[in-house]
Amino acid sequence: DVHKRQIYYGDLPYEKLEEVSPARDTFDLMVLKMAADRNIPILGICRGLQLMNVAFGGTLYQDLPTQHSSSVKHRQEESGTTPTHPISIIKESKLAEITGQEVLQVNTFHHQAIRKLAPGFKITAWAPDSIAEAIEAYPIRQMIGVQFHPEIFTAAGDTTMHKLFKFLVNKADTFHLAKKIHSRILSIDTHTDTPLWFKNGYSVGLRKDNMVSIQKMEEGKLDAQFLAAFIWQGKRDDVSSQKAVESTTLLIQSIYDEVAKYKDFCGIALTEKDLVRLKNEGKKAFFIGIENGYAIGKDLKNIKKYKQMGVNYITLCHSYDNDICHSSTHTEDATQGLTQFGREVVKEMNRLGIMIDISHASEGTFWDVIKYSTQPIIASHSSSRTLCDHDRNLTDEQLRALAKNGGVAQLCLLDTYINKTPKAASVCDAVEHLDHMIKVAGIDHVGIGTDFDGGGGLQGCKGDNDLINLTIKMIEKGYTEEDLRKIWGGNLLRVMKQVQEAPLFSLKKRR
């Protein structure tokens, strides 16, 4: 039995508990949590199913004979190879997909069972007496649990039960391949709002509730992350604009201070060479971006200041119009684009080698930037408007124009941008967006920008540790290692290098 302590059950201990082992419970639950954090495929059998449920917040019938009236004897006296009752399998479940069955005859050797189901799981098979016989957490986690013992049937030659183990091995092989690929490529998430949380005591060196941390990056096999110095849009008078500059400067400095605390595990990256060096040293890399050109204030000289502070891109606006351009969201006119000052900002960013980010920009702004920028541009966190009609997403026409420009569109993992029913948005939907964007723009012009700690997060991808799931889903769709190399960082690094080298090329031409 699972130990009677309330922390495991979520309810009070019951007198009919049988033999327990607190040491085994502690070990099993620790292994289960560590495996789940890393998205390792898991198959739980009998007690394993029960542990899954209590580990993630469910409860158990602690003694079926006295707590649940039943027509089924769940402790059979027959041998394990003898099936003693049927189970009904939910048609749309992973278990039905694996076995190809809607009814299975199973054995039964338990006196505990699921009472209250843990959040994030669904029951996928029932016994005739309404006892849950199987659960799964797909696509949130790669976890399946069964109350019966398929290993006994499999050892006796049952080919249907054997499919469960083949499924687990295949999932493990794909997981292993995903990790191997990540060890050989450079993986970058181009947008997080994590610095907003520093003032609340959050640290990138601690694995807590925030989506971004060094530990989670390692679990998800992510090499680098852009930390955005985000500034809310405020009043546009001289005094307010100057305060925005000062606030942004402090935010950027806070990124340096935070990374310095964990210099043995991470570092600031300005170029691809920095990223390669840090990866070879076994460290994570943090690039710096600015979200909202309001941070520039009224003076173009601030762009040079930010360049000297290591800023690699500036998102021209956020959810409201500013002195640079019109926003896609709260705007006077989405067809309007760059202001005269905005055109000067684009020119100066080109001159200094800072990437121009058009996420959050109106369509008018997008087309103006395409027209006036001499360098490729990026959308650091935007998805497909064809699949989810939201003003923050890019139309197919925009995606094609971005590709022609040589730029890159980075898939955003914010549920509202991914699915018309946000709560249902999952990693599977995200890969559908990615797939569509690649079909429209081409494999050389798409990447990933999660928007973690700023609204991003979907079922199956709620933090850095879950990013390996994107890779797994892409492998299952047939994407090659070379494809993944481009999507996860190669495309963005190509644009960044071209933009950074443009000022040097211009200087050589003048000489």
Write out the residue ranges for each language-model feature:
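Substrate-binding cleft of carbohydrate-active enzyme catalytic domains
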Residues: 344-369, 395-407
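N-terminal hydrophobic targeting/anchoring segments and the immediately downstream early-domain regions
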Residues: 177-333, 389-448, 452-511
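Alpha-helix-loop-beta-strand connector modules within alpha/beta enzyme cores
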Residues: 28, 334-352, 369-379, 440
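Glycine-enriched alpha-helix->loop->beta-strand junction motifs that scaffold or abut catalytic
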Residues: 140, 221-222, 311-313, 352-354, ...
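Short, small-residue-biased leader/transition segments that mark boundaries at the very start
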Residues: 2-3
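Amide-donor transfer/coupling interface in amidating biosynthetic enzymes
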Residues: 21-40, 65-179
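Histidine-centered catalytic micro-motifs
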Residues: 106-112, 146-150, 187-194, 311, ...
